[in-house]
Swiss-Prot record:
Record's protein name: Large ribosomal subunit protein bL34
NCBIfam families: rpmH_bact (TIGR01030)
Lineage, highest ranks first: Bacteria, Pseudomonadati, Campylobacterota, Epsilonproteobacteria, Campylobacterales
The gene coding this protein: rpmH
HAMAP family for the chain: Ribosomal_bL34
Gene3D superfamilies: 1.10.287.3980
Pfam families associated with the record: Ribosomal_L34
Length: 44
């Protein structure tokens, strides 16, 4: 049986990347929340 997680960088970036987050209001909310929390990595 094939495992469910088959990592690839392109789809990863396209769905969870910084630029994608910045596109929508809610995405920006996510980035700001992570900034406020002091996360080292804001996005993928």
């Amino acid at each position: 049986m094939k495992r469910t997680y088959q990592p690839h960088n392109t789809p990863r970036k396209r769905t969870h990347g910084f630029l994608v987050r910045m596109k929508t209001k809610n995405g920006r909310k996510v980035i700001n929340a992570r900034r406020a929390k002091g996360r080292k990595k804001l996005s993928v």
